[in-house]
Amino acid sequence: MADSYRKLIIERLEDVKQRNKQTATLYNNYSKLAEQLEKKHKYGTSSSNSSQLETGELARVKEEMAELYRSKCQNDQRLIDANHRIADFEKKSSAIIAEKIALEATAKSICAKYAKTEVELQRLKVDNDQLNDERIASNTTVTMLTKQIQDIENDRIHFLNKIRELNEQRVDFLNAEVALEEKRRNSRIQDMITSAVQDITDKDTKLEEMLRAMPDTNSNGDLLLGDSVPSRAEFVLECEEGEVNDVHWLDGETFATGGSDRNIKIWKVDGHGGYTRIGTLAGSNAAFTRIDYERDRKHFIASSNDKNVRIWNLDNSRLLSTLSGHSDQVTCVKFYQSHSAVSGSADRVIKIWDIQNQRCSRSLFPASKVLDVATNMGASPSLFASGHFDKKLRFYDGRSTDPVRTVDMGGRITSLDVTMSGCELLVSTRDDTISLIDLRTFQTVHCYSAENYRTSSDLSRVVLSSGNEYVAAGSSNGSIFVWNRNSTKLEKQLCSNSENAIFSLSWNPTGYGLLSSSKQKFVTLWK
């Protein structure tokens, strides 16, 4: 039985030897021991049968047998250890094989992705070529369209020049019509003067003495007879097709109106409760908002809702220039120093214009809608003021871009008017109050208000009388309030026949007579 096990072990070791060379030495040693053991076994059997062996030899053989068994045990242990190592090696080999399989799968996946990427790259190259072709075609189209735009722009400029020429021709025709009307009017006046002179037999010496005793004149050169508080309506003039935004005396007998009908009309008072239109200034494409007059050069300036400022020569009613540059309606304009003007707009920009060169010399950015401007301040010829929607009164020096002083008011500032001395400024605000500010200290000197007084609009205009004795303002209910400048006492409340809001007032340079314009095309002379 032991021999069969031994043979089985030897056969398995032989098989392991063939598969693994690392156990060859172990196998050889075990084979030798097995052969020696078998020889001893045979030798021991033959000796027992012959009974001739000596007892000492048998003991030696037993000792060798014991030694062989010990060697066998050691070799068996080594075999077990070798089997364990073989098992470990097989596990590691299996892990390596599994890892190899995984790596091969990963390699196949990477190769597939690479092939897919190659296909995608090829597709992108094709798309890129197509896009490049489209880009070239687009550039060609853009070049062609740019040329077309340039041609259209050239045509637009040509048409604008043509329109300008036609407008100039239209203005020339209007000027010719005005000149003809002026000539006819002068002829009628000359006939009237000739007829009147024939009835005069002697001079009124008393009147001459009275006029010599009154040498005072206002800043416009008109004889200042003294401020008089008006009490009645001399006449009511229906002059525009809509709102009359501004009215302005040019001298003691002539005044101008401007509003929604896009024309400025010049009127003359005959002194007997009547009036005559003596001229028309045209050229605007929208309603006029503010007008101003420079008597020395007979220049008339007006701001308009068509974003422009225009200047006329009043002698021949000829349009001298159109000042463009604002991006929104121009709310106000005033002559400023010599050969300059200041305009304010809803685009939150103040522009100083060089009238001679017909260009903007400086732009100021107060960051708020401009509602009115005031010039001719006595403190400095270059100083001017602007009233704004953000309730701030800003003072500028035309030589710099930042305000030199800012005064906070109680409401949106609708109107500014400077006293004859240039030392005080009248300010109207939407909180239904009017303030008189000392320009030397920038402090409020007087405040004017009344129970029924309501500021009519953001562009309503208040005025000082020619002699600076009174303050006048129009209300939203159609009434006109007159205060004493120094005492702030309400001297008079003039009530019109309608309840249309009063937009603008202008006091006659002689101090006798107040013009008012309303929302519904009416102008009233109060005396």
UniProtKB/Swiss-Prot annotation:
Gene3D superfamilies: YVTN repeat-like/Quinoprotein amine dehydrogenase. GO terms for molecular function: protein-membrane adaptor activity. GO terms for biological process: aggrephagy; autophagosome assembly; autophagy; macroautophagy. Signal peptide: none annotated. Expressed in neurons, pharyngeal muscles, body wall muscle cells and intestinal cells. The keyword Ribosomal protein does not apply. SMART domains: WD40. Keywords: Autophagy, Cytoplasm, Repeat, WD repeat. CDD domains: WD40. WD repeats lie at residues 239-277, 283-324, 325-363, 365-406, 408-447, 454-493, 497-527. Pfam families: WD40. It is found in: Cytoplasm. GO terms for cellular component: Atg12-Atg5-Atg16 complex; autophagosome membrane; cytoplasm; phagophore assembly site membrane. Disulfide bonds: none annotated. Homodimer (via N-terminus). Most likely a component of a complex at least containing atg-5, lgg-3, atg-16.1 and/or atg-16.2. Interacts (via N-terminus) with atg-16.2 (via N-terminus). Interacts (via N-terminus) with atg-5. Interacts (via WD domain) with lgg-2; the interaction is direct. Belongs to the WD repeat tipD family. Most likely a component of the atg-5-atg-12-atg-16.1/atg-16.2 complex, which is recruited to the preautophagosomal membrane and associates with lgg-2 to promote autophagosome formation. Although its role in autophagosome formation may be distinct to the role of atg-16.2, it functions in a partially redundant manner with atg-16.2 to regulate autophagic processes. This is Autophagic-related protein 16.1. The gene is atg-16.1.
